[in-house]
Amino acid sequence: MTSIAEKWQKEWEKAKIFEANPDRTRNKFFTTVAFPYPNSPFHLGHGRTYVTCDIYARYMRMKGYNVLFPMGFHYTGTPIIAMADDVAKGDKELIDIFKNIYEIPDNVISKLADPLFMANYFRDEIKKAMKEIGLSIDWRREFTTIDPEFSSFIVWQFNKLQEKGYIVRDTHPVGWCPVHHIPVGMHDTKGDMEPEIGEFVLIYFNSDLGILPAATLRPETVFGAIGIWVNPDVTYSIIELDGKKMIVSERAAFKLTFQFDNIKNLGSIKGSELTKYKAVNPITGKEIPIMAADFVDPNVATGIVMSVPAHAPFDYYYLKKNKQQDMQIVSVIQVEGQGDTLAKDLVEKTNPKNKDDLQKLTEQVYRIEYNKGKMKDVSSLVKPEFVNYFKSFIGLSVPEARQKVTEFLIEKGLGRKIYEIMNRPVYCRCGNEVVVKILKDQWFLDYGNPQWKALAKKLISNMKFIPPEIRKDFEFVTDWLQKRACARTRGLGTPLPWDKKWIIESLSDSTIYMAYYTISHKIRQYQLKPSQLTYDFWNYIMLGIGDIDKISSETGISKEIIREMRNEFLYWYPLDIRHSGKDLIPNHLSFFIFNHAAIFPEELWPKAIAVNGFVLYEGKKMSKSLRNIIPLRKALRIYSPDVVRIALTSTADMGSDVNFSDSYAKSVGEILRRYYEFIKELPKYDGEGSEFANNWLKAQVSSIVLSSTKNMDNIDFRSTINDILYSFDSYLREYIDMCKADGKEPNGKLLREVIETWIKLLAPFAPHFAEEIWHELGHTTFISLEKWPTAEESSEDLYYILIHEYHKRIIEDSQKIINYYYKGKPSIVKIYVAEQELMKVLREAVQILSNGGTLKQLMEKERPSDKKLANIIRKIYELAVELDDNMKKLILGYNINEREILELGTKYMSYKLGIPVEVYDVSKLDKSKYNKEALPLKPAIIVE
């Protein structure tokens, strides 16, 4: 099938069918997907997001929309430079991956040390992969983020943001590369991890050696601190900070130099030596021991932790382990319905086996006490001079107490805040661990600006999200998002217009580039120079602001061209949907929302975001260490493009991870081949079929068209593929069996119509295969441009579907009886149907149940004259409870005669069971011989 794919890709390109131009007679649909960093070839994991976007674009194109699906390449920032540096350094692991996984020739690998060569080489590789997998892209609009023309657009964007007060120069904590001395964001790190910065509160515990600054996320528990933990196997540094002598881990001493200017290193001491000393709780004034614990991580905060066993499972566990649990445990937080010592109680109850168990308990205690905890009266625990202040703490919630304690400690000089990478370790692409730096005089996008947040929230409230549950993720990110460094001193990209020593970083120049796609090809077509693309030019194109005569005169661009570009922008904008992976929600996608809200009027705000999960290979995450990275182009050669497209999008819903497996991919290829063979044999079917079978098949096809359309609208590709690839296959087989059972040849004309409908439904997923079949059926048009099938809900269609479903139920029940009671082959199946008047009772029972009613209501309505009839009504009610949805639809929607509908299917039932089937009224049943009864839709089945 790979050769078929190559054939149709050439035909599409030759016919330019995916080049989209404004057409005022048609509704437009503008879709984009995050453009890639060309710092390595695509692997299977990349494929899902891009194919998802393409399938939806193809679907909307077949729905009659004028679809624009463009593509560019993201050269900005450090990802490319860092990768090129690794090649230049001779990174063995990277070179091995390039050579043995991606099969890059040695003579090319040596050239990849040049960042621009790398970017251009991998751009070409990625572009080939995109074409080979069948993405329906308008390549005229391609650009890179270091094109001077695009840079002029970014300069305009940043000037607009500064005008609005959304760019500020400030001091703020940022993720930082300690080697290259630049801020680090998600796309600057290995594994694309966003450094999550959090606050620790340092509490100063005095000792004879100096201050032990215990780092905590829970300063409100300091009243219950009965000891200090240090790691005995670690070397600690003695430093001077703010004129105070302090003891912290060596790693902490290094990291704190990025947050404070006034640090001096005075010496070192082993953790085991520290345990010979005592410390003083600065709030209670009590002397407490310094204790050894190997759970203390010297890489987290200061490497010094206070021991609060009443509220920290680790602390109680290690006291117990060290046989120190008799130390007085001080509880300061009360949770209604829980004991005073929640941490202790949970440790005793669950008996944790390892640090992972303890971590889970810690998170549980933290969550319960944070959400439900109230402060006890702590005034009796504190120094006399603090009593009056802390008297007011009784009854405070934990969040309130946390804030007040933090403020008190800082005000009294008993503590301070520091910052830490909460999801550590995070590594810069250069290989060094990221730290937090308090960055001074840095340029920030002020996402914490209340006015800007309000605009972003308004945009989110009017947006569609797929899957819908991600809306809350965007709302959460919008709430916590604050200042973000928007420029670097290293990397490729656009200089900050008012401070050119800074380069705008990669997550800041990729927020509104979708607007640039609308006119990028016009810039190329009219050979416009970067110098012509001024602030006023962009202001007019994007916002309609300015005097066109003046702009034309100043730029040398004709008014006709300017108007044409403005009109093209207005035709395509706003963006209808943005596709991406779920990892970009907390950064790129949220910044995309903020920047659109800041710059464009509401009518040009994006309409929807679709986010998909990741791709596993054989159930495991693809990684260098597992050596299971599968290059996309290699997968396309092995399985074919259409098989890969289906396998990447059909085994999970949008928000979940897809598992790409060799066996499933091969099974997809096999079913496509089976369809192909069936279609080749269509000419041999020249009969008329049976009336019931024909009507049933048409009904099933209409049902699939309706469900597929609904599922495609919601980007539910898993359900769609299940319908059009698997259900459709079973319906075709069943139809042929139904015709055979009736002694009729299948209707060839009907089968051709059905196949033509099916191939249109499949076209967005397997466009190359669909084009081939479409043309083999004698068509000369591109199926990619055909109309998506339509259908209307029909009670008649549903009737045929439900009746046949009932026939299959009878077959299933009969087969169970045969399998259970007969070793040999029986001679006949006799079906005895209940009295027709009982059908009305069943209908009443189903209606009552659907309204939440009971058996009592059914009895009151039917008023049985004797116990025997009452017993039958009770059994009918119980049957109604057990009925599946299809049988409920049948009983409620149609005035059926059970015997007649069963007689419609006797030939089919006989064919499937391999023995004659006869239908009788229950009055014909010999009760002396068979102790059976018949209920409506549950006839008595006798096998002889």
From Swiss-Prot:
Catalytic activity annotated for this protein? tRNA(Leu) + L-leucine + ATP = L-leucyl-tRNA(Leu) + AMP + diphosphate
Q: Where does ATP bind?
A: 624
Q: Where is this motif: 'HIGH' region?
A: 36-46
Q: What is its EC number?
A: 6.1.1.4
Q: Top-level EC class, please?
A: ligase
- Coarse class of the protein's main subcellular location: cytoplasm
What GO MF terms are annotated? aminoacyl-tRNA deacylase activity; ATP binding; leucine-tRNA ligase activity
Q: Where is this motif: 'KMSKS' region?
A: 621-625
Q: Which GO terms describe its biological process?
A: leucyl-tRNA aminoacylation
Q: Which family does it belong to?
A: Belongs to the class-I aminoacyl-tRNA synthetase family.
- Put simply, this protein is called Leucine--tRNA ligase 2
Taxonomic source organism = Sulfurisphaera tokodaii (strain DSM 16993 / JCM 10545 / NBRC 100140 / 7)
Lineage at the top is: Archaea, Thermoproteota, Thermoprotei, Sulfolobales, Sulfolobaceae
Protein encoded by which gene: leuS2
